[in-house]
Amino acid sequence: MANFFSSDFKLGILGGGQLGKMMLYDTRKYDIQTHVLDPSPDAPCKIACDHFQQGSLLDYETVYNFGKKVDTLTFEIETVNTKALAKLEREGKKVYPSSKTLEIIQNKGAQKLFYEKNNIPTAKFRRFSNKAHLTEGITDNKVKLPFVWKSTQGGYDGKGVSIIKSGADVAKLPDVECIAEEMIDFKNELAVIVVRSISGEIKTYPVVEMEFHPEANQVEYVICPARIDNNVASKAVKVAEKVSKAFEHVGILAVEMFQTKNDKILVNEVAPRPHNSGHYSIEASYTNQFEQHLRAILDLPLGATESKVGGIMVNLVGAEGHTGDVVYKNIEKIMKMKGVTPHIYGKKQTRPFRKMGHVTIIHEDIDEARKIAEKVKNTIEVISK
């Protein structure tokens, strides 16, 4: 086995946001040397990595030359140049997850076709090359209102997703490649994090339940374990494992799903990296998702995925009407609460609904944890000076 610890081994991370920063907690723990590439000079990772490089994640030469300096390359954001990654792979560089996996996941249309091809349950959909093509599809009754519109590229944290109820809603849409997806009448939005090592060892975390902000379409609460029947949880895990095996990914794969009114499980989308739905694991699990991702991409034994205690994550996002230098109002009040741990991401500027941090609540009783989470949400505010 290669010596990754206290050695000359170099791990490259594409993207220097909060996910990378939290991954660096564990590279520090194991004394793994890290190089990070990010376009922002104020990226959260900058203070915690060994070497920071400012540069575009979409520029071929920048990504290729960065990748040549390191031994293994991973990423914390999907919007990276896959052609540069593919060239590095051809030259023998280790890239996890692979450029092939990432290329499918980068495009929501390609992702949906992948599910169809691999008999993975997902909502019915149609692909459209532009807005005119979509309008034609509605006129020809190929798409029925209402439906969920998704941009095939670039959407995240609720961006690039709209509920379309009328022609007026269509008129407001950008002229981009998109998919029109059937509206699902669902009970719950669930997620399962699957981790797969280079050797093919696979483990899954418990099913989590996600509660969304009604306007921003962002996750407000992640609840582990999900408050669902065991048979539904078992179905969700099986579907997530099927998705993982189809992709043959290496590292973390977060699989977001719908639980329908009749308890079917439908895959919504996936993320091939540490994910918002797994942040609770830092305090609540035997092995957190960031350490687990490192273990997988370095082909080390995977850690236990069970929870030590129930956990709920509350996202901290910028308050409406506030843009500028950030202030975490009342943070000292939530720090007095038992089992409450805030995480601040290191973004200096706030704006409405921008993810600025999260808070984890741990408790033996998940219903009690949910009450505390509500109290946390109503106490702390992310505002500007």
Cite the ranges covered by each PLM segment.
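Short, flexible turn/loop "capping" segments at secondary-structure junctions
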Residues: C45-K46, T152-Q153, T350-R354
